[in-house]
Amino acid sequence: MSESSATPGAAATPPRPAFVPKPPLLAAAYMLASTFIALSQSLGQGFLSANLTTLGGELGATQSETMWLMVVFMAPRAVLPLMLIKIRMQFGLRRFAEVSIIVYVAVALLSLLATDLRSALVVELLSGIAAAPLSTLAFLYMLEPLPPEKKLTIGLPLALTMISLGTPLARAINPLILTDGSWTNILMLKLGMSMICLVLVYRLPLVAAETMKVIKGMDLVSFGLIAASFGGFVACFTTGATYWWVEVPWLGQAIAASIAALVLALVIELHRRTPLLDVRWLTSPAMLHLTAALLIFRIILSEQSSGAPGLFQTLGFAQEQVAPLFWAIAAATLGGGIACALVL
């Protein structure tokens, strides 16, 4: 399983050019571009989550069938960041940014053609693939104008805030956009935002870094196993409550197969000199502490996207009635992110 041709450190990050301060207006433009890219990506997920019931009516599908739209959107976003790191290192930041945003615009155009559940599933799968690099771009654009000592204390909290802001903001503005109840309004908004992102990426290029060949053949094998594993987990945990866990045998079978695929991938990665997934680093005390903190953070945030909306829907509240709550959540999210950037 080991790669004899690899050498330790071959997959190290290529050196970045020395930091050159940008004029204040240009620095602000990069940070605004990051904000817009982050919102474009996160609003897409937020709108999909908020309108699954509406989509079922438009596509002629049941609630359990429309849940698969969320599955195919989230699955590639869960696993693609693993490969995006090496893709970015091998092909360069600028090319990575330009190709990513072109694909995102193309998928936004394609989404206008979805007329039934089958075509919608294909479009949402492509949307998840196209949206995965946008989180990376949002981070890169937020960090680009900041000096090295400010990247983690100011840039990181602000980028995370803008990415997290999309979910509550989508539910807050959703009633304003769906005035006639048509999903096409959402698609046109996403298309317009993607085109603005395209202009921003080409007008504000990222500083090019050195490239190096880091993608190995075994990376594709490991990535395939991890993708199958994460895809199975996403499918089970997203649809489990809808189908109910003990009623359908395939849920347990899919979880078992996902665990087996993940274990096999970890065994392969442990025997590689330049792994796609550095298991030893991920299981270090510092990373385990960070993982636990992020897990708690995500559990708390899940209340915004599934807990509270599900409760209000069960109680019979319309989206217009709960919109003020999500405006408050969005404002609190923004305020918390800014406070974090000022305090750290």
Regions inferred by a protein language model and the residue ranges of each:
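Hydrophobic transmembrane-helix bundles of small-molecule transporters
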Residues: I163, P175, T179-A292
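Central cavity-lining transmembrane alpha-helices of secondary-active solute carriers
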Residues: M70-K86, S135-L140, W327-A339
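Membrane-interface helix termini in secondary transporters
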Residues: T54, L82-K86, L176, L342
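Cytosolic juxtamembrane N-terminal segment immediately preceding the first transmembrane helix
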Residues: M1-L43, G57
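Small-residue hotspots at the loop-to-helix junctions and early N-terminal turns
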Residues: G56, G60-M67, T153, P157, ...
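Extracellular/periplasmic helix-loop-helix junction of adjacent transmembrane segments
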Residues: S49-V79, S119
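12-transmembrane solute porter fold
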Residues: A27-G44, L48-L52, Q63, V107, ...
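Helix-loop-helix hairpins in multi-pass membrane proteins, especially solute transporters
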Residues: I85, M89-G217
